Amino acid sequence: MDIERVEQVRAVERLAHRRGLALMPRAGLAAADFVAARLPAGAQVLALAGPGNNGGDALVAATLLQARGYRVAVVMPAGPARLPDDARRAWQDWCAAGGQASADLPAHAPALVIDGLFGIGLARPLGGAWQGLIDQVNAWRVPVLALDVPSGLSAASGQPLGDPPGRPVRATWTLSFIGVPAALRAPGAAAWCGQQHLSLLGLTPAFLAEAVGPCGQATATAARRSGP
């Protein structure tokens, strides 16, 4: 079945958590495989890791790509102090692999950027510092892989966040996990999302259907009634 609303994605995530399924390693692997299919080993990759689980996905991808021979740099403007648990584990794995992070963008553009700053949960306008960083990334005009949604774009409306609207990451590709919110398929979103791709993270249609309920409505009860 198609997952087309943010609340449906959240319902799937809740059920996965209830079942003990770790989705972040799967998302990071999907992102790393996506990059590896389009960029030769040894190339420079910059992973932008934000303060939430989207940043954790980017950190997993960074760790895997470094292990495959890519030259990977990580930029974490907000630092690791307030990362949620799963993302913190991804940060610890990155550090254990010898990785470091900077708060600032490098002086020179990489071959490819992974945008893991903000995901589908972002509902507020970007602040000035975040907007400045995104503007610099866009000015590089290098390929950008956005995870879930280009940072600064509303997954609910498909429009840039803010009034006046901000300037989201301009992605070459957007790799959505579990489902693609319908708003991201709207014509106005295409300029920011680039080519749309979807990874189901190995979840079966039956699992997705159970998570969102018999009528396709995302409900917490689907997660609550399922044992581990």
From Swiss-Prot:
Domain (YjeF N-terminal) ranges: 9-209
Single Gene Ontology MF annotation: NAD(P)HX epimerase activity
Xref: InterPro entries: YjeF_N_dom (IPR004443), YjeF_N_dom_sf (IPR036652)
Keyword Nucleotide-binding: yes
Record PROSITE patterns: YJEF_N (PS51385)
Protein family per UniProt: Belongs to the NnrE/AIBP family.
EC number(s) given by UniProt: 5.1.99.6
Protein name per UniProt: NAD(P)H-hydrate epimerase
Binding site for K(+): 54, 115, 151
Record-listed (6S)-NADPHX binding positions: 53-57, 119-125, 148
Domain of life: Bacteria
Cofactor(s) the protein requires to work: K(+)
Reactions mediated catalytically: (6R)-NADHX = (6S)-NADHX; (6R)-NADPHX = (6S)-NADPHX
Enzyme class: isomerase
Note describing how the cofactor binds: Binds 1 potassium ion per subunit.
Keyword Isomerase: yes
Keywords: Isomerase, Metal-binding, NAD, NADP, Nucleotide-binding, Potassium
Functional note: Catalyzes the epimerization of the S- and R-forms of NAD(P)HX, a damaged form of NAD(P)H that is a result of enzymatic or heat-dependent hydration. This is a prerequisite for the S-specific NAD(P)H-hydrate dehydratase to allow the repair of both epimers of NAD(P)HX.
